[in-house]
């Protein structure tokens, strides 16, 4: 991001009121204001709200990118490339480039206190009330969520594939780690046996044994989710150790928080037409929201039903219909699909439309 901004400095212009702006530089569909004081460039990024960070799933640049994502040969990873605790911190912790509003920070803090059953002081520890949280922090987490984090105690799988941050959304693999049962043509989602929030209570130990499998792929030309991910990610060895345990906990906590924030925003939008119109101008909605909703292991049954409804309609619906589906997904006990056929085999569950694969589900084991 810093290099992107430096590259954009040469394009700085002044608007009608004399303020320096960067009109040709688009990040988060936001405005970038800069000022130069004693040859030091100061910048402020104004965004349109939480949903604007979805746009940052497109190419990002930040300091750790070369270290984390530069090498593709998975068989020749040097010891210096092993993911360090500080690297996980850099991916998960807040950055000062585009501060969250107090409303966003306080909302997330309330979610922490409520869902993790902690008091106000502990909530502040997870979501401090200052300017350190930013949309770019959230977007990096979303990007990792899209990749399908894979953490397990099996020695052969002690790694975390992370998608290349420059990958386009259409090339990403994302996680949909939910179990389903099928009764005729009715799909009934089943939540994981252990809520992910519970894993926060066992002194980080739960994160070492949490297996979030590769998730869902859409129209992937018959290539497995694992193959897709490995093509554009690196394999990071020996992730869960005494040194990295705390960082893994922070990573998982941030993913959980962002999932909760996403759910909260979806519920707010479902009942707020004015905000809905503003978001509609920001992003192509249906498929992006589907990919967002299917990106996290901690999303509940409502989000899973929502994903199935979206796929059943082939994502060709407008935003208001999307929000109606979201509301419906929260009230229905099961989802009846008009054309999907569900098959369970070889460790993955496939939803077929006629002979075309529409949805692959790789269940999570917690």
Curated annotation (Swiss-Prot):
Gene Ontology cellular component annotations, sorted alphabetically: host cell cytoplasm
Pfam families listed in its UniProt record: PolyG_pol
Molecular function terms, GO-annotated: RNA-directed RNA polymerase activity; single-stranded RNA binding
Region of interest called Important for ssRNA-binding and formation of complexes, as start-end residue ranges on this chain: 1-11
Keywords noted in UniProt: Host cytoplasm, RNA-binding
Chief location: host cell
Disulfide-linked positions: none
Subcellular location(s) of the protein: Host cytoplasm
Remarks, miscellaneous: There is a strain variablity in the inhibition of the host integrated stress response (ISR). There is a correlation with the abilities of the strains to prevent upstream PKR activation and c phosphorylation.
Complex formation: Homooligomer; in presence of RNA. Interacts with protein mu-NS; this interaction allows the localization of sigma-NS to the viral factories. Interacts with host G3BP1 (via C-terminus); this interaction induces the relocalization of G3BP1 and other SG proteins to the viral factories periphery.
Family (UniProt): Belongs to the orthoreovirus sigma-NS protein family.
Cited function: Protein that binds to ssRNA and participates with protein mu-NS in forming the matrix of viral factories, which are large inclusions in the host cytoplasm where replication intermediates are assembled and viral RNA replication takes place. Plays a role in the inhibition of the integrated stress response (ISR) to escape from host cell translational shutoff. Participates in the disruption of stress granules (SG) through its association with host G3BP1 and mu-NS.
Name under which the protein is recorded: Protein sigma-NS
Gene that this polypeptide is encoded by: S3
